[in-house]
């Protein structure tokens, strides 16, 4: 069983390298037309240049997974902001794409919790489609739209989970097919359990990104030993291995909040279940300390008897 690792957005080890510098619409409104264009250009350029720095860092540390920041382009989906964020930065997008392809990196997006398809309000679905389209356009500009995924949660229950799931199946039909093909779903920590999310993924033929921390915060009746093989099976029609999310609770009181680092003892039960299946999979670390937490966790995990470190960020067990 081979496990490859990655982290989310910011490389904590790099100084002043945020790929998610932003600009509020309020501050945007206060500027003249030229100042708006200049500010949007400068912030986006900086985010892209920082992303390139981060990718070089990942390559140097043999980190094969990385989640791009959804905020890489400020105000990209705001209805009152017009900005050619693709055409203006074609060379930078291509540089990012070249690095990803040359080093065979697995790159993804994870829009925020407001991108959902369970609402009975049409504008919420419209906004979700707009946001998914933005993420797809960025992947396409990079040149990896046919091999990367955009991960979201199922959404809210709105007092009736059964009807909300029905709306999901109806609303998702409005998402262009080429974008839906690049979509994954994740179980959440309050509403949709692992079993419920799995059922939706199986019906829609959407790969399931399993989050172990969320699973432990929102348990279902079915044991993980039964669920995990079926979760991995949702990836069978793709040409890549399954991906899971890992983080640890901040505390017993704040169980859903992410800790700074990974608690190996919290994760061990999941790893033992995965070992019995003996299927290769990728792990996205979602701890607050990001790359630092990832590297520390790999070091701790590699000390377990039978676990072999085969590269800086890849283990075999």
Curated annotation (Swiss-Prot):
Is-annotated flag, keyword Nuclease?
yes
Q: Which SUPFAM superfamilies match?
A: Xylose isomerase-like
| Record EC number | 3.-.-.-
UniProt GO molecular function: endonuclease activity
Q: Which UniProt keywords apply?
A: DNA damage, DNA excision, DNA repair, Endonuclease, Hydrolase, Nuclease
Is DNA repair set as a keyword in this record?
yes
Q: What does this protein do?
A: Component in a DNA repair pathway. Removal of UV LIGHT damaged nucleotides. Recognizes pyrimidine dimers and cleave a phosphodiester bond immediately 5' to the lesion.
Protein name in UniProt: UV DNA damage endonuclease
Source organism per entry reads Bacillus cereus (strain Q1)
